[in-house]
């Protein structure tokens, strides 16, 4: 239930505008207009995002992946984000309109199709704060983004205004669907249209499944945040690739976050002497939630060389300081089974990055666990020494490698 828009302020220093001994001054809230463009030209306007009675985001913080944003205080967790509990009873209505977003259809349905959802919604602010919304559009378009993608935007969250969003409970299915998606670690990004004359260009929406509330964060550095969020969205689209590996939210497998998608290519020995066949598989790299693996400069195709694991014993010290990622391969099951069989027989994959690639990673090692049925990638932090070490190993043990490959060929020939 929404309380009246205004409530009497207590006089004295505790009032919203301060000033001991002054009579209480009523807080004027602009009426919500039915149009998003002003009727006529107006003079110079003050900043439309400002807090009168408190510094930005006082009593609120964003922690975890996004880092601290304000004074530490008890809050509610929003999948790595936290803000203080807010109740509508002490808030003032600042905006009313409609929120629209697209929701991925249920599994086993057309993956390319999405459901368009809309809900009437209202934005509320604390008493004593002012949020100019008279030029906001009456419909806001929201894009759902995994919160892990926002880890690099922590500094831009440190200076934001909070607003609480409330949705009219007319469409229970849409509201439940939105709560379910955002409760599973997604944030809403509302990009305001350029034709809108308001100064707000972007607003982030978060949801707490524990407190059942939606909180909006409006960064004061709108220009910097818009550029940053566009880069995040572009990087995500590049990772997904043409046509998309998935529709809607980024894939999460076993609580891991998709960091890269592309193609892995390698050559495996054939039963015929001195012959090999080229193989490739669509592949994806996952990292733990909250971790960042910069893959925007990774090539779309990685080339892997199969090496007997016994050749790598001298490189064990360099493996001790490596980052672990998980590889996942899709589509061609026969090719995948063949790769699993080879690597289960004592081979490791050495993935060399092209020198044309501008990323810092030059080599990573791929290992396979037949017990857990997973591929683990090791990215040594000391890339330079590892590259030199793997080259020496290959150069000095070429004969051993050749014998191992021939033995594998014989085993495959006997098995066929």
From Swiss-Prot:
Alphabetic keyword roster:
Activator, Cell membrane, Cytoplasm, Membrane, Nucleus, Phosphoprotein, Transcription, Transcription regulation, Ubl conjugation
Low complexity compositional bias, start-end: 27-36
Query: Known post-translational modifications?
Result: Ubiquitinated by the CRL2(KLHDC2) complex, which recognizes the diglycine (Gly-Gly) at the C-terminus, leading to its degradation. Ubiquitinated by the CRL2(APPBP2) complex, which recognizes the Arg-Xaa-Xaa-Gly sequence at the C-terminus, leading to its degradation.
Q: Which InterPro entries match?
A: Med25_PTOV, Med25_PTOV_sf
The answer to whether keyword Cytoplasm applies is yes
**Which residues lie within the region annotated Disordered?**
1-53
Q: Which residues carry this modification: Phosphoserine?
A: 53
Biological process GO annotation list?
A: positive regulation of transcription by RNA polymerase II
Q: Which Pfam families match?
A: Med25
| Signal sequence, renumbered to the chain | none
At the top level of its lineage, which domain of life is listed? Eukaryota
Q: Where in the cell is it found?
A: Cytoplasm; Nucleus; Cell membrane; Cytoplasm, Perinuclear region
Q: Specify whether Ubl conjugation is a keyword of the entry.
A: yes
Compositionally biased residues, Gly residues: 12-21
Q: Which GO terms describe its cellular component?
A: nucleoplasm; perinuclear region of cytoplasm; plasma membrane; transcription regulator complex
- Tell me the function of this protein: May activate transcription. Required for nuclear translocation of FLOT1. Promotes cell proliferation.
Family, per entry:
Belongs to the Mediator complex subunit 25 family. PTOV1 subfamily.
Assembly, in brief, is: May interact with CREBBP. Interacts with FLOT1.
Q: What is this protein called?
A: Prostate tumor-overexpressed gene 1 protein homolog
Q: What is the scientific name of the source organism?
A: Rattus norvegicus
């Amino acid at each position: 239930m929404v309380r009246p828009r205004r409530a009497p302020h207590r006089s004295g220093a505790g009032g919203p505008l301060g000033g001991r001994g002054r009579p209480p001054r009523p807080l004027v809230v602009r009426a919500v207009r039915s149009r998003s463009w002003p009727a006529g030209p107006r003079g110079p306007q003050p900043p439309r995002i400002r807090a009168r009675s408190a510094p930005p985001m006082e009593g609120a913080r964003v922690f975890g992946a996004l880092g601290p944003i304000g004074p530490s205080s008890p809050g509610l967790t929003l999948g790595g984000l936290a803000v203080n509990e807010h109740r509508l009873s002490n808030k003032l209505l600042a905006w009313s309109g409609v929120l629209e977003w697209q929701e991925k259809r249920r599994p086993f349905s057309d993956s390319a199709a999405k459901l368009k959802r809309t809900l009437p919604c209202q934005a509320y602010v604390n008493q004593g704060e002012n949020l100019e919304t008279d030029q906001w559009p009456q419909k806001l378009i929201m894009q759902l983004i995994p919160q892990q993608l926002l880890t690099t935007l922590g500094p831009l969250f440190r200076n934001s205004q909070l607003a609480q969003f409330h949705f009219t409970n007319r469409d229970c299915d849409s509201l439940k669907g939105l709560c379910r998606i955002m409760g599973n670690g997604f944030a809403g990004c509302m990009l305001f249209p350029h034709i809108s004359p308001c100064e707000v260009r972007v607003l982030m929406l978060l949801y707490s499944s524990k407190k059942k509330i939606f909180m909006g964060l409006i960064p004061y550095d709108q220009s910097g945040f818009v550029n940053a969020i566009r880069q995040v969205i572009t990087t995500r689209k590049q990772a997904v690739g043409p046509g998309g590996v998935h529709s809607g939210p980024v894939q999460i497998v076993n609580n891991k976050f998709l960091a890269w998608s592309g193609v892995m290519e390698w050559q495996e020995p054939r039963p015929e002497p001195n012959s090999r066949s080229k193989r490739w598989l669509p592949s994806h790299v996952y990292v733990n939630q909250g971790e960042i693996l910069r893959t925007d400069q990774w090539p779309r195709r990685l080339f892997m060389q199969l090496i007997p694991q016994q050749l790598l014993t001298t490189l064990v010290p360099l493996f001790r300081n490596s980052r672990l990622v998980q590889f996942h391969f899709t589509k061609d099951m026969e090719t995948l089974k063949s790769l699993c069989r080879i690597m289960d027989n004592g081979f490791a994959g050495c993935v060399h990055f092209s020198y044309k690639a501008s990323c810092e990673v030059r080599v990573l090692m791929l290992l396979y666990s037949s017990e857990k049925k997973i591929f683990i990638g090791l990215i040594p932090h000391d890339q330079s020494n590892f590259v030199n070490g793997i080259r020496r190993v290959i150069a000095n043990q070429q004969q051993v490698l050749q014998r191992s490959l021939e033995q594998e060929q014989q085993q495959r020939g006997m098995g066929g």
